[in-house]
Amino acid sequence: MHSSSPFYISNGNKIFFYINLGGVMNMTISFLSEHIFIKLVILTISFDTLLGCLSAIKSRKFNSSFGIDGGIRKVAMIACIFFLSVVDILTKFNFLFMLPQDCINFLRLKHLGISEFFSILFILYESVSILKNMCLCGLPVPKRLKEKIAILLDAMTDEMNAKDEK
C-alpha cells in the first residue's frame, strides 16, 4: 500500500478500491498551499471579518443572527474551496476558457481549476464587502467609488442606504 497515494488497487484475484483519506487530505493541503487565489480567499475573508467587526463596534449595532449568518457563509466558502480542490486533484479540469485572454495574460495563468475559478468569484464578492465595511467604518474611500458601492448595496441589501446619504 502506498500511503502517499489517495487510491490503492490490489492486483490479486480481487481489485480493491478505496480512498485513503489521509492521502487525499495531504494532497489537498499541499494543493491549497500552492495556489495564490485560494490564499487570497482566506485573506479577504479574514480582512472582511475584521472590518465587519470594527464596523459593528463603531455603529454599536451588534446583531448576533447577522454575525452568525455571515460566519456560516464564510465557513461555507472555505468548505467549498476545500471540496473543489479535491475535485481539481481528481479531475484536472481547466477553466481558462472562461476568462478573457487579457486576464489570462495579465495573471500569467497556465491552468485554472474549478477551485481557483470559484476562488476568484469569492474574492470579488468579499472585495465588495470589504469596500462596504471600509465605508461604514469611515475610512477614506474615493467619492465616486463610495457612491457606486452605495447604489449597488442599496439595490441588493439594506446595509447602506444610498438614499439616506444624499
Swiss-Prot record:
Compartments where located: Cell membrane
Domain of life where this protein originates: Bacteria
Topology in the lipid bilayer: Multi-pass membrane protein
Main location, first listed in the record: membrane
Protein name: Holin-like protein TcdE
Residue ranges that the Swiss-Prot or TrEMBL entry lists as coiled coil: none
Gene Ontology terms for molecular function: pore-forming activity; toxin transmembrane transporter activity
Transmembrane segments: 15-35, 36-56, 77-97, 111-131
Pfam families from the UniProt entry: Phage_holin_4_1
GO cellular component term of the entry, any: plasma membrane
Any Gene Ontology biological process: protein transport
Annotated InterPro entries: Phage_holin_4_1
Protein keywords: Cell membrane, Membrane, Protein transport, Transmembrane, Transmembrane helix, Transport
Assembly mode: Homomultimer.
Phenotype of null mutants: Cells grow normally but accumulate a strongly reduced amount of toxins TcdA and TcdB in the medium.
Family to which this protein belongs: Belongs to the bacteriophage holin family.
